């Protein structure tokens, strides 16, 4: 949707206790990725990172682990925002890829390719911003080996659907619709430096 916040969490409320899991989808234009590699990176050594900037974090344990996967099917962003009333249902949801009751995911919560993944462990006293090496995923997109349907950002499997008040990390990151200067970034860095070897002539002392 158009909400300013992306959420990744496993919330376990005290009232009507049942795990409430949130995952986020982020997509960067394939045309920009291909252009970057064709016209800028070339044959240079490169690396790529997904950067998300934290807005709020609660319930972090010593080993809270964020996983990133490539989404395996198309989806519609929609125009909804948190706490819309009535609820806006014209975009991707836990059960549907496009809008309410249309184009269901094969697996509720979103379909993604498990052959490619990246992760970052967040600790109690560490920085909560994400800076995850996603080079293995971007490699496949840049070579058009897999379709670019964006990233799935989620907690690792063992930290989702946990019925315990001791395991309920709630992470909120700024989305592209934030009014801050901290939207998500797909950073691609490369080394295009070059050098020339010089030559020295012997200096005569006579």
What are these regions (language model features)?
Residues 77-79, 162, 196-198:
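Short helix/loop capping segments that flank catalytic or ligand/cofactor-binding pockets
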Residues 24, 64-66, 184:
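Short beta-strand/loop motifs in extracellular/secreted proteins, especially
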Residues 51-94, 155-159, 176:
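Short edge-strand/loop segments of extracellular domains
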Residues 37, 59-62, 160-167:
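Extracytoplasmic/secreted cell-surface and envelope-processing proteins
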Residues 1-59:
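A short beta-strand-loop element at or near the start of a globular domain
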Residues 196-206:
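Activation corresponds to long, low-complexity, non-globular regions
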